[in-house]
Regions:
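Terminal targeting signals and extreme-terminal segments of soluble enzymes
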Residues: 11-150
Length: 150
């Protein structure tokens, strides 16, 4: 470390202390959205996303699926990092409940994850997404199942 993670990372990703292939973060769907992981660790993390026209629904505001996706991704990465330090294995999402609280159409949003429950079989994480003025635009909870290592 420090290792930049995600597409167009401008700051190094800090606090990653477990054996995870950082090159895999920010690939796939995260890359399509433009998610950048800023800080990650077993107790939570931060990701950012700059809103552009691709992420808007027909009425000019951010599509709710964008928020659901950031929430799912950050919760999954956070849960995986915790599990890697606490016995190993893999996590899979089993429920994503996202509330859309404020409509925006531009700017950069920041998502922050924090654990609610981390147990032997399941984890529950809360993610809050704020805009550049620190207003909450969405929040969500993701329940994840801990699976044994194969």
């Amino acid at each position: 470390w420090p290792t930049p993670v995600g597409r167009a990372a401008t700051r190094p990703c800090r606090h990653v202390r477990v054996s995870i292939d950082l090159a895999d973060l920010g690939k796939g769907f995260d890359n399509e959205l433009g998610v950048t992981y800023v800080e990650l660790g077993p107790d939570g993390g931060t990701a950012r996303l700059t809103i552009d026209d691709r992420l808007l629904q027909p009425w000019g505001i951010v599509h709710g699926g964008v928020y659901c996706s950031i929430i799912e991704s950050l919760a999954s990465v956070s849960a995986q990092l915790w599990l890697a330090e606490n016995g190993g294995g893999n996590v899979v999402g089993v429920n994503n409940n996202t509330d859309f609280l404020r409509a925006i159409s531009s700017g950069t949003v920041t998502a922050v994850s924090s654990p609610i429950h981390r147990g032997r079989r399941q984890q529950l994480w809360q993610i809050t997404i704020t805009d550049e003025r620190d207003r909450v635009v969405a929040r969500g909870q993701v329940r994840l199942q801990n699976l044994p290592a194969e």
